[in-house]
């Protein structure tokens, strides 16, 4: 029977690669030097990248230079359109990662700065190196295992455990993602749990020598560029993917808490209740929404929002649910911030 490289398996197996030969040093995957994919295979990656769904009517760009695939967009004088294009370019970047993973290839973003780099009439947001890679896991290039064993996965109290394998082939669906789908079933609690994991869930690879693997790439191994919120039944929750144990009562440790919490916690999958809200008017009438926000005013945070949107659009394909999506405008951002959601950027509406 032919192996299915399912959406969930690809999300769980995605990782960055390098040449150092040590998966626990910097990046998890290992490139095979000078082993370039065939033009036919590379065209399949580019096809997924070119099919990125767009909120804007701007021009996304891709080009090759010195063996790197550059991604970006044509400049515009409209600040909101530029914001949209940064999000969409993040979706492009993630499309490259997912396509490479599904095809058994390795890739890594060699960054162009936290806000991108100007190239004449374009803004370049990333440059990807794409090569063949060695097996990333004991079972080969794919894994359906949870994080562990060094930092074992801790089941959350409020969400069902995510599936890390499925029956829907990833690559064909990656070529036909959309911003909305009017047909399909209403998302239930299991679907919501799966979407949260797809957005920013924990996976079994290492990042910067730590078991911090995620379904999305992170610049420099950073863990807190963005937040994920859930709105359901007029309640606001924050998605939690790492248990945090603060050293209470020891003020001298306070300045180290944000570093120590990653070292002493564990990967998890849960939501934390925050407050009651009444914000469906700002969510186009939706009663359930997954809201993506940024914790810093950089473009890398917008790209990360794009990664999460790309993953959730893909995950809906195997769930068979209806959904819409949106990027918030200034008035909506202010209203949502008054309801406890800091710097909201975009949402999946269910």
Show which residues each predicted segment covers.
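Short hydrophobic alpha-helices that are characteristic scaffold elements of the AMP-binding
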Residues: 98-102, 317
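Mixed-charge, glycine-accented linear interaction segment located at domain edges/termini
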Residues: 291, 308-311, 316-318, 327
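Short, hydrophobic/amphipathic alpha-helical packing segments
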Residues: 42, 46-49, 89-97, 192-200, ...
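N-terminal amphipathic, basic helical "cap/leader" segment at the start of enzyme domains
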Residues: 1-80, 112-123, 137-288, 299, ...
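C-terminal edge-of-domain segments
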Residues: 121-140, 345-350
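Residue-level detector of anion-binding/catalytic polar loops
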Residues: 106, 322
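Short pre-catalytic strand/loop immediately N-terminal to key active-site residues, enriched for Gly-Thr
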Residues: 80-88, 298-307
């Amino acid at each position: 029977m032919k192996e299915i490289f399912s959406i969930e398996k690809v999300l769980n197996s995605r990782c960055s690669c390098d040449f150092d030969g040590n998966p626990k040093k910097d990046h998890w995957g290992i490139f095979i030097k000078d082993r370039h994919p065939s033009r036919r295979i590379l065209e399949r990656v580019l096809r997924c990248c070119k099919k990125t769904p767009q909120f804007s009517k701007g021009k996304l760009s891709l080009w090759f230079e010195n063996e790197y695939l550059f991604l970006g967009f044509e400049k515009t004088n409209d600040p909101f359109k530029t914001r949209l294009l940064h999000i969409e370019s993040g979706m492009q970047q993630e499309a490259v990662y997912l396509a490479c993973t599904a095809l058994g290839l390795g890739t890594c973003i060699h960054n162009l700065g936290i806000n991108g780099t100007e190239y004449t009439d374009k803004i370049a947001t990333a440059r990807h190196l794409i090569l063949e890679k060695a097996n990333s896991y004991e079972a080969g290039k794919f894994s359906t295992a949870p994080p562990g064993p060094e930092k074992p996965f801790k089941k959350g109290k409020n969400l069902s455990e995510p599936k890390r394998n499925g029956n829907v082939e990833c690559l064909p669906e990656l070529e036909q993602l959309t911003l909305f789908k009017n047909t399909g079933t209403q998302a239930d609690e299991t679907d919501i749990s799966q979407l949260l994991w797809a957005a920013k869930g924990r996976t079994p690879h290492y990042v910067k020598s730590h078991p911090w693997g995620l379904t999305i790439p992170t610049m420099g191994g950073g863990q807190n560029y963005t937040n994920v919120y859930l709105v359901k039944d007029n309640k606001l929750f924050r998605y939690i993917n790492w248990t945090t144990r603060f050293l209470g009562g020891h003020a001298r440790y306070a300045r180290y808490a944000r570093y120590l919490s990653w070292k002493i916690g564990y990967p998890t999958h849960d939501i934390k209740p925050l407050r009651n809200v009444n914000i469906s008017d700002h969510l186009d009438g939706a009663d359930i929404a997954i809201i993506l926000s940024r914790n810093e005013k950089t473009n890398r945070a917008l790209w990360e929002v794009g990664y999460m949107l790309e993953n959730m659009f893909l995950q809906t394909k195997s769930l068979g649910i209806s959904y819409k999506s949106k990027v918030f405008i200034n008035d909506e951002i202010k209203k949502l911030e008054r309801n406890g959601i800091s710097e909201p950027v975009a949402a999946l509406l269910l």
